[in-house]
Amino acid sequence: MPDQTQQFSFKVLTINIHKGFTAFNRRFILPELRDAVRTVSADIVCLQEVMGAHEVHPLHVENWPDTSHYEFLADTMWSDFAYGRNAVYPEGHHGNAVLSRYPIEHYENRDVSVDGAEKRGVLYCRIVPPMTGKAIHVMCVHLGLREAHRQAQLAMLAEWVNELPDGEPVLVAGDFNDWRQKANHPLKVQAGLDEIFTRAHGRPARTFPVQFPLLRLDRIYVKNASASAPTALPLRTWRHLSDHAPLSAEIHL
């Protein structure tokens, strides 16, 4: 009998949206950013630095949405979304968000902050596409600015990945702030995660600063999955929308 098993693929996008403002907070561009994100037609979107709420900005920022920023971005294109609050301040809070065309059956936000005021988190979502009925484990990541903090956070991330069911696909994407390129080795050795740009091109993609990318800060890792068409999206479209270049890829299960 012929093999009835069919490969399932989906498109992922990750981007640090800088709370919906241009560099140095000169201009609010969330509506333009939503339009750009929609053109990618990603099935799963991992967002960092998403404004969850703010009491002051709506009073003086033109085009400030009535909903949370992640709901505004999801709009009618992504039926499911999840938000993990990381940084909290008197006026509001921001964190990571995941938008999905497929049902998010469970999500939780884990605090990976290490000493001091720098608040960081990993947003986990268990996503189950109806056409497969099988779980995809997605983690949206924003790690710290200090190397020692990042190493501790990478260890926490690896431990969490290892707690997931054996053989099930894992996607880890986001802003790793890993300008010294020290994340790939521990994540591969400790958790079996492969960075897809490194697998395809020998090293992670340059993503920061978006005007002239030099640093390789943003990543897409997979486990129990393969990837194709890893792409740092064209700067001419995105350079005024974020300080990071977005990354996208096709993931195959």
From Swiss-Prot:
Pfam families: Exo_endo_phos (PF03372). One of its GO terms (molecular function) is catalytic activity. GO terms for cellular component: membrane. GO terms for biological process: GPI anchor biosynthetic process. The gene is ybhP. PANTHER family: CALCOFLUOR WHITE HYPERSENSITIVE PROTEIN PRECURSOR, ENDONUCLEASE_EXONUCLEASE_PHOSPHATASE DOMAIN-CONTAINING PROTEIN. It comes from the Bacteria. This is Uncharacterized protein YbhP.
